[in-house]
């Protein structure tokens, strides 16, 4: 039996390495303001709370589709806008690339400035339940305050 690997690969012209660790839930503003590094090595600075940076191998973001086309979408969460690329290659279930739909996107960060940009791994329509949207900002805040404050989260240990 083969040894487990750190990631899976999605084949294609712009292959994405999928991490084995769960995605970190973030808001667009957190990435704009606190992300350090570059593609493949992004970290979320937590110096303001006296913690080591949080490794961002993959992120989970939610937002409303503002515009979409050609495998690219622009979304908006409570803190600002972000872009998602590679949507033509990801499973999405029901059609959700329609302006006004509320979706979740799991992906790998490509850029954080001037606005976050993800290479999509998964997208799901969450529009049927308005609680997803109304609670998202509080959920992210709570996770960062209580769960992601643990020293081993995001380190791959």
From Swiss-Prot:
Residue ranges of DNA binding: 45-115
| Keywords of this entry | Acetylation, DNA replication, DNA-binding, Nucleus, Phosphoprotein
In the record, which positions carry Phosphoserine? 7
Any one GO BP annotation for this protein: DNA repair
Q: Which residues carry this modification: N-acetylalanine?
A: 2
Subcellular location(s) per record: Nucleus
Q: Name one GO cellular component term.
A: cytosol
InterPro entries assigned to the protein according to its UniProt record, in alphabetical order: NA-bd_OB-fold, RMI2
> What are the protein's GO molecular function terms?
DNA binding
Membrane-spanning ranges: none
Described purpose of this protein according to its UniProt entry = Essential component of the RMI complex, a complex that plays an important role in the processing of homologous recombination intermediates. It is required to regulate sister chromatid segregation and to limit DNA crossover. Essential for the stability, localization, and function of BLM, TOP3A, and complexes containing BLM. In the RMI complex, it is required to target BLM to chromatin and stress-induced nuclear foci and mitotic phosphorylation of BLM.
Q: Which family does it belong to?
A: Belongs to the RMI2 family.
Per its UniProt record, what PANTHER family does this chain match? RECQ-MEDIATED GENOME INSTABILITY PROTEIN 2, RECQ-MEDIATED GENOME INSTABILITY PROTEIN 2 RMI2
What is annotated about its quaternary structure and interactions?
A: Component of the RMI complex, containing at least TOP3A, RMI1 and RMI2. The RMI complex interacts with BLM.
Q: What is this protein called?
A: RecQ-mediated genome instability protein 2
Name the lineage: Eukaryota, Metazoa, Chordata, Craniata, Vertebrata
